[in-house]
């Protein structure tokens, strides 16, 4: 069985109710600036996050996300740049292949990027996968930006 990584999952299974709640918050302009998804590894938290991000970033595009069927439009330029990890509105933080923790330099780079203006008027997202691997220095630096977010 071939398992795709969450960033490449174009269809969302079993988490539609959660996505509906997130998209409703977004449409009603009541979504928070921080969302924590918690649960066992492998249940689809990252996949859900990528689907929500695709929904938001393609809402005014020709190749929109399909919220009725929970399908990402593979023709979407946003999807392609997200899949290639080159989307300017998405920053992904995770452990590097050779590391067992998310280090302070990754968080410093995140903070530096968040202090810069966006290239477009679309929302920006930060996805921290495996947040339990943050070391103490990383946690403290991240808490500062979470407690005192800038206007970007």
Q: What is the predicted function of each stretch?
A:
Residues 115, 140-152:
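Conserved catalytic/switch belt of AAA+ P-loop NTPases
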Residues 1-137:
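Clamp-loader machinery-focused feature within the broader ASCE/P-loop NTPase space
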